[in-house]
């Protein structure tokens, strides 16, 4: 079940725009703060917050879809 969910999240990330996917990966897997992610991507912190909201909502939908 966990492996299946991770595979679904991976597929969901593949469908995300590059900036959303990059922000999510930098934050969640590299442990960067939103400020650091914003600097790395050359965008504002509010943009990173929007990207993360989009990615987290999509992950939630994958994890809890019935």
Each predicted region: which residue ranges?
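Short, conserved glycine- and acidic-residue-centered signature motifs
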Residues: 2, 30, 52
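Short helix-coil-helix linker/hinge
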Residues: 13-20
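Helix-turn-helix DNA-binding module
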Residues: 14, 30-47
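Acidic, proline/glycine-rich intrinsically disordered inter-domain spacer in sigma factors
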Residues: 1-11
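DNA-recognition helix of helix-turn-helix
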Residues: 41-65
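A short pre-motif secondary-structure segment
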Residues: 23-24
